[in-house]
Regions:
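Cleavable N-terminal export/targeting peptides
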Residues: 1-58
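Transmembrane beta-barrel domains of Gram-negative outer membranes and organellar outer membranes
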Residues: 50-215, 221-309
Length: 309
């Protein structure tokens, strides 16, 4: 057998192995999310009085941006596939990013009806991009782009709240696991409580503008509008379901990314979860594209554990 034929067979076997591994990872994550939901469903419900049930219904374990708890620790696993550059010039392949994000929030009362909400994120990534330094698309591991955020929230009434702030994103992930750019993200939003339904239901539209301002000049400039027209519905027994809880609706105003044919990304995004105790909530989120002219992702899943104290 010639050496050329051996090399071809070896590459085919390696490629098949990677495809099998990626399929196993996707199945494993899906099973993990299903198992978490089953655990929440089967978890015994502690009997309580009507007064306690009413209090629990309005409790917040960190899922409501405009009602931040004093302290929050969040652990989130994030699985995403998106178009990336292939091994040959002009070709496109799927790039998988797996993230374990560690978040800490702290809220301060500035004055009656005024709150300062602080946030920091540390993403730990595993990603398989194809590049000159990683031509085989092996998984690379490390820290992604960390960020800090500050927002001022003003509660106008029990029904209305408004807020504004900004997030600073540092290029700690370097050129491979991050954007290579410093970014600033102004944020503005409002909250309207749906007391007609229950105390845990609300509409919460948020708008963000992500723009790069420094960093690696060879990297693509970032400039995109992000929308989250969140509708949260409180359900019995501490369950909740949110439509568009993440700012995944995007309009790209910056440099085009791999696979882009237009400026709009419109997904279907839903999160379902349960407050498993007065100070903890567990949720699962799924995002799939409807319009993918600006391909932010092909598939997104997130599992969050929020613990407040």
């Amino acid at each position: 057998m010639s050496s050329g034929r051996c090399n071809v067979l070896m590459k085919a076997r390696i490629s098949a192995g990677w495809e099998e591994r990626d399929a196993a990872v996707m199945v494993g994550r899906a099973l993990f999310g299903v198992c978490l939901l089953v655990v929440m469903i089967l978890r015994p419900t502690i009997a309580a009085s009507q007064e306690a049930q009413s209090r629990d219904q309005s409790a917040n374990a960190g899922e409501d941006f405009f009602k931040p708890p004093s302290n929050l620790f969040q652990m989130m696993t994030y699985y995403k596939t998106a178009p990336g550059s292939g091994s040959t010039k002009g070709s496109i392949t799927n790039v998988t990013t797996e993230t374990l994000n560690l978040r800490y929030d702290h809220a301060l009362d500035l004055a009656p009806m005024w709150i300062l909400a602080l946030r920091s994120d540390l993403p730990l990534l595993a990603k398989n991009p194809i590049s000159s330094g990683n031509p085989d698309g092996d998984y690379l591991h490390g820290v992604g782009d960390a960020d800090v955020q500050a927002a001022v929230i003003h509660n106008l009434s029990q029904r209305w709240a408004v807020g504004f702030g900004a997030r600073l994103i540092a290029p700690t992930g370097g050129d491979t696991l991050g954007s290579g750019k410093w970014q600033i993200m102004p944020i503005i939003g409002a909250r309207y409580a749906l007391w007609e339904l229950n105390s845990s239901s609300y509409i919460e539209p948020i708008i963000r503008y992500d723009v790069s301002f420094a960093g690696d000049p060879t990297k693509k400039n970032i400039s995109n509008l992000q929308f989250a027209p969140t509708f949260n519905l409180g359900l019995p027994d501490r369950w909740f379901i949110s439509f568009y809880p993440s700012a995944d609706i995007r309009i790209n105003l910056g440099d085009p990314i791999t696979g882009q044919t237009g400026r709009l990304f419109l997904p279907f995004d839903v999160r379902i979860g349960r407050r498993v105790s007065d100070n903890a909530a567990l949720s699962f989120e799924l995002g799939v594209p409807i319009i993918k002219d600006y391909p932010v992702y092909n598939l997104k899943t997130q599992v969050r554990l929020n613990v407040t104290y």
